Amino acid sequence: MSEFKVKTGLAQMLKGGVIMDVVTPEQAIIAERAGACAVMALERIPADMRKSGQVCRMSDPRMIKEIMEAVSIPVMAKVRIGHFVEAQILEELQVDYIDESEVLTPADWTHHIEKHNFKVPFVCGAKDLGEALRRINEGAAMIRTKGEAGTGDVSEAVKHITKIKAEIQQYKENLKTESDFAAKATELRVPVDLLKTTLSEGKLPVVNFAAGGVATPADAALLMQLGCEGVFVGSGIFKSSDPEKLACAIVEATTHYDNPAKLLQVSSDLGDLMGGISIQSINEAGGKNGARLSEIGW
């Protein structure tokens, strides 16, 4: 079995689960108790990164290690786009997965990390099929929608998953000849065989999770019904008044996403949820609510 197949197999093990952002071992324990399939260890959740206006880098490895020691579920950590040395450090730390994340300040505005150079599986964000396939070609073992992290507004995540699905369907219908496939692969900057495999299967060849703006059980179920295979929850849980109850509810909603009776049950009496900010209030050039993080990446 190829090393890439091993890495994609590890990512497949998370399918149907919820991955939660945590900033302390105590939060990681809450996430594990609530049924999270993995946690993302970071020093600040995306909502706080967005407000800070500062350069956001890889978290302190000591903090990540403390979280790794606190739980038995897999632990992920983020690196800046293109910062392969941060990735080398996290691989040496033996994190379970690395997220090359647009939420952090990019280290390289031209290149993403060549992920085939690492044994640890990588997660990457994408807002359309071209981005997803470019990241997979670089070695990403899991794709997630970019959404708009730190907002509590799920609309961008919805837009990204529906766009990827629509592009796959459109290309399946419209690409007929070898020259059609070659032209589209050139346009997307990906190998023809990768494009053909994706269209033949009718979906990405790696697991595709939802991320960015998920704040309620209904948000999680919506994205699962739209075709996502699991959910990342960032700022939403620990910006709420009852994090453990909300975390349990989102896990239940992700599992029972097509059961309205169960969704009604888990959506009730959750306390105050994350207030959030709407996508429309974010100035793409920056401002009090920060930049459009989903536009970062190429």
Curated annotation (Swiss-Prot):
Record flagged with keyword Lyase: yes
BP-aspect Gene Ontology terms: amino acid metabolic process; pyridoxal phosphate biosynthetic process; pyridoxine biosynthetic process; thiamine biosynthetic process
Pathway it works in: Cofactor biosynthesis; pyridoxal 5'-phosphate biosynthesis
Induction: By the absence of external thiamine.
Family statement drawn from the similarity comment of this UniProt entry: Belongs to the PdxS/SNZ family.
Catalytic reaction list: aldehydo-D-ribose 5-phosphate + D-glyceraldehyde 3-phosphate + L-glutamine = pyridoxal 5'-phosphate + L-glutamate + phosphate + 3 H2O + H(+)
Protein's name according to its UniProt entry: Probable pyridoxal 5'-phosphate synthase subunit SNZ3
The species this protein was found in: Saccharomyces cerevisiae (strain ATCC 204508 / S288c) (Baker's yeast)
